[in-house]
Amino acid sequence: MEEIQRYLQLDRSQQHNFLYPLIFQEYIYALAHDPGLNRNRSILLENPGYNNKFSFLIVKRLITRMYQQNHFLISTNDLNKNEFLGCNKSLYSQMISEGFAFIVEIPFSLRLISSLSSFEGKKIFKSHNLRSIHSTFPFLEDNFAHLNYVLDILIPYPVHLEILVQTLRYWVKDASSLHLLRFFLHEYWNLNSLITSKKPGYSFSKKNQRFFFFLYNSYVYECESTFVFLRNQSSHLRSTSFGALLERIFFYGKIERLVEVFAKDFQVTLWLFKDPFMHYVRYQGKSILASKGTFLLINKWKFYLVNFWQCHFSLCFHTGRIHINQLSNHSRDFMGYLSSVRLNPSMVRSQMLENSFLINNAIKKFDTLVPIIPLIGSLAKANFCTVLGHPISKPVWSDLSDSDIIARFVRICRNLFHYYSGSSKKKTLYRIKYILRLSCARTLARKHKSTVRTFLKRSGSELLEEFLTSEEQVLSLTFPRASSSLGGVYRSRIWYLDIFCINDLANYQ
């Protein structure tokens, strides 16, 4: 641990370029396996099996094999002949990927620390609390009244392996590390089902998520470098915080140096970026770019992005992956929400001397609604209700104690309320709560061989209190006078930074 601290204290502008020797250091694999290095855990001192554990003995064997064979200089034609890892190929390759990902993250970490330290007087956010999904919250809170069109963009795919290596050349100057990456990609994984997937969504092996998240986010960063102009040209682009918003856990700060490069090489196209009302956000494998401009302007954006990505990444990116939609009559599935723009009609009466005028005005409002039909379908699949939304009992849980049954239903209800707290209309959530509450009552009544009416009379209001969500409890304490009628407060949208996805409804089979 002290050795890596000394390494991080070296000249950050030069020494981080030489990362290759770290691949032979044992502590790198320990840090990659357990960054906290909890001293109470003895797993690092064990000699376990090959599948799911780690030991220094296996690390020593791996490093010894790497010292004995200069396998990083082998050509791609001889990859199938290289058997230096022997029978432990799967385990050793996983360990190398974890160690390599940890090492390559060092330059990004140093750049991030340097950029955050430049903000004097500002508190540095803990990186593990910020992810790219959090940029969607201010995007949904933006004022969409002036926007007309939106671009739905699929991030370019598939990607050639060499493109991934070339992308990292801008950050990692160590040629040996790049040779190791190239060798590693060709030797150990068939990425046709991972990074180079022909599907818009990317899936990663659970054993090597850190390594592939690193590669994927590096590639996405290159794709998003085009939009750095927007942040500098527009004061309304509040959706992506390039200074503090981190992409994953450690180091993905948004660097603005690319602006200078683009400003010199693409003077002709800079006028496209002068729209003061552009909104950009990325989620999963898609991006959204909204504008107040005309159809002609947004169409120019479309062809510019297609040509830029084709030239920069040497891939065939056809225009069918970018769709132009008019915001006023288009709805989309967005992070589990059904998002749409609706017109709120209003009438204004104007009095001028003896004449009066009635002026009709329509204000655009961006709604984030709970998709009730898919959500009921998920509940029906998990046997909480029928496909029509009628609550039914959960026979699988009848053997559990009453407290466990209630706790499981309450947890699902609170998870759904927590995730969809940003909905502009909460009525659907209360319907979901009704389904889960009555399903819980039917399950308990089935267990005690009683009717629902009899069980509810015996339990009283305790079951209702259990299903009181944490949001309702907080609002009741904050607004005690309005605890009986919090309809107006519940209509406000609340966003939580610990929201990443909806937990599986059928976790407790």
Curated annotation (Swiss-Prot):
<dbReference type="InterPro" id="IPR002866">
    <property type="entry name" value="Maturase_MatK"/>
</dbReference>
<keyword id="KW-0819">tRNA processing</keyword>
<dbReference type="GO" id="GO:0009507">
    <property type="term" value="C:chloroplast"/>
</dbReference>
<dbReference type="Pfam" id="PF01824">
    <property type="entry name" value="MatK_N"/>
</dbReference>
<dbReference type="InterPro" id="IPR024942">
    <property type="entry name" value="Maturase_MatK_N"/>
</dbReference>
<dbReference type="InterPro" id="IPR024937">
    <property type="entry name" value="Domain_X"/>
</dbReference>
<dbReference type="GO" id="GO:0008380">
    <property type="term" value="P:RNA splicing"/>
</dbReference>
<comment type="function">
    <text>Usually encoded in the trnK tRNA gene intron. Probably assists in splicing its own and other chloroplast group II introns.</text>
</comment>
<keyword id="KW-0150">Chloroplast</keyword>
<keyword id="KW-0694">RNA-binding</keyword>
<dbReference type="GO" id="GO:0008033">
    <property type="term" value="P:tRNA processing"/>
</dbReference>
<keyword id="KW-0507">mRNA processing</keyword>
<dbReference type="Pfam" id="PF01348">
    <property type="entry name" value="Intron_maturas2"/>
</dbReference>
<dbReference type="GO" id="GO:0003723">
    <property type="term" value="F:RNA binding"/>
</dbReference>
<comment type="similarity">
    <text>Belongs to the intron maturase 2 family. MatK subfamily.</text>
</comment>
<dbReference type="GO" id="GO:0006397">
    <property type="term" value="P:mRNA processing"/>
</dbReference>
<keyword id="KW-0934">Plastid</keyword>
<protein>
    <recommendedName>
        <fullName>Maturase K</fullName>
    </recommendedName>
</protein>
